[in-house]
Amino acid sequence: MSCIFCKIVKGDIPCVKLAETALSLAFLDIAPTSKGHALVIPKEHAAKMHELSDESCADILPLVKKVTKAIGPENYNVLQNNGRIAHQFVDHVHFHIIPKPNEEYGLGVGWPSYPISPEEIKALGEEISSKIK
């Protein structure tokens, strides 16, 4: 097993644990972008969010909420990346809780606008909603 997060779940690699459920684990990031930067991971290994079981999905977000409240930031980002070009560097689903105390620390995000017409948005919405089961 080469997944660093699976090794943390097993206890093979230490972490500064913040909280744990039967299905999820929260701990401090060892290379934080701000004070209190934490990770919440499912104990189940899944590389991308859409591969995660419904049980793990249902378990993890309440833990993200509890950890965020405990960290106590007024401003923060909750980030979950899937795939290399989306900036995922560990192939195990994980949520970053990143406090944003000021302009210097925390996550800086650019948000480029995608050119799409209202008609294209409507057609895309219909296409996507038809695939949701």
UniProtKB/Swiss-Prot annotation:
Q: Pfam families annotated for this entry? A: HIT (PF01230)
Q: What InterPro entries does its record include?
A: HINT, Histidine_triad_CS, Histidine_triad_HIT, HIT-like, HIT-like_sf
Output the SUPFAM superfamilies linked to this UniProt entry. Answer: HIT-like
Enzyme class, one word? hydrolase
Main location class? nucleus
Task: State the Gene3D superfamilies in the record.
Answer: HIT-like
Q: Which parts of the sequence bind AMP?
A: D29, I30, N81, H87, Q88, F89, H94, F95, H96
State the compartments where it is located.
Answer: Nucleus
A GO MF term: adenosine 5'-monophosphoramidase activity
The cross-references to PANTHER family, in alphabetical order and at most eight, read: ADENOSINE 5'-MONOPHOSPHORAMIDASE HNT1 (PTHR46648:SF1), HIT FAMILY PROTEIN 1 (PTHR46648)
Physiological role = Hydrolyzes adenosine 5'-monophosphoramidate substrates such as AMP-morpholidate, AMP-N-alanine methyl ester, AMP-alpha-acetyl lysine methyl ester and AMP-NH2.
In which family does this protein belong, per the annotation? Belongs to the HINT family.
- UniProt-recorded name of the protein: Adenosine 5'-monophosphoramidase hnt1
